[in-house]
Amino acid sequence: MASNWQVQQAARVVCEGGVIAYPTEAVWGLGCDPWNEVAVDRLLALKERPVHKGLILVADDIEQFDFLLDDLPAIWQERLAASWPGPNTWLVPHQDRLPAWITGVHDSVALRVSDHPLVRALCRLTGPLISTSANPAGRPAARSRLRVEQYFPRQLDKVLGGALGGRKNPSLIRDLRTGDVIRSS
């Protein structure tokens, strides 16, 4: 695992508008400050991902998403709390509380509270992060630091070393309103 100093350095890069790569539960991720439109635009350009698709926000704790969850029905809040931290991403109504560069054309946003210690340590310092697989569109998700560096040679502001979490597949994605599975794990 990365040292506390390395995590602090990565957090500083994020807070200064940088784009980083880091290991997650199953694949390497790219991340940046979700409130920094320039950083998000750069991340999307690196991935060759259109903004209309939207992005995932990852956090250390459910409380980091309180500004989105406070007005939701109690049953939905209980469903989220029971599944986090863990490999569960939920599509949650954003109630126009997030910019379009995060949500794309959707009325919901993808949220996950990670159980990966490195992701959690990073989010404790930065707050929620954009989290998307570290790969250009149409290519397999990176499962090693070497692959990240091959995909994005000298294009990232920081690559935070560490091990993947051991899961074979990316997180399950479900719609909070319906319970429907959008992507199985």
UniProtKB/Swiss-Prot annotation:
Which is a Gene Ontology cellular component entry for this protein?
A: cytoplasm
Q: Does the keyword Ion transport apply?
A: no
InterPro entries xref list: DHBP_synth_RibB-like_a/b_dom, Sua5-like_dom, TC-AMP_synthase, TC-AMP_synthase_SUA5
Catalysed reaction(s) here are:
L-threonine + hydrogencarbonate + ATP = L-threonylcarbamoyladenylate + diphosphate + H2O
Give the Enzyme Commission number. Answer: 2.7.7.87
Major localization class: cytoplasm
Q: Which residues cross the membrane?
A: none
Which molecular-function annotations from GO does this UniProt entry contain? ATP binding; double-stranded RNA binding; L-threonylcarbamoyladenylate synthase; tRNA binding
Q: Which residues form the YrdC-like domain?
A: 4-185
- Top enzyme class: transferase
Q: Where in the cell is it found?
A: Cytoplasm
Q: Which domain of life is it from?
A: Bacteria
Alphabetical GO biological process terms: regulation of translational fidelity; tRNA threonylcarbamoyladenosine modification
One Pfam annotation reads: Sua5_yciO_yrdC
Q: Enumerate the UniProt keywords alphabetically.
A: ATP-binding, Cytoplasm, Nucleotide-binding, Nucleotidyltransferase, Transferase, tRNA processing
Q: What does this protein do?
A: Required for the formation of a threonylcarbamoyl group on adenosine at position 37 (t(6)A37) in tRNAs that read codons beginning with adenine. Catalyzes the conversion of L-threonine, HCO(3)(-)/CO(2) and ATP to give threonylcarbamoyl-AMP (TC-AMP) as the acyladenylate intermediate, with the release of diphosphate.
The family annotation for this protein states:
Belongs to the SUA5 family. TsaC subfamily.
From the Swiss-Prot or TrEMBL record, give the protein name: Threonylcarbamoyl-AMP synthase
Species of origin reads: Ectopseudomonas mendocina (strain ymp) (Pseudomonas mendocina)
> Which gene does this sequence derive from?
tsaC
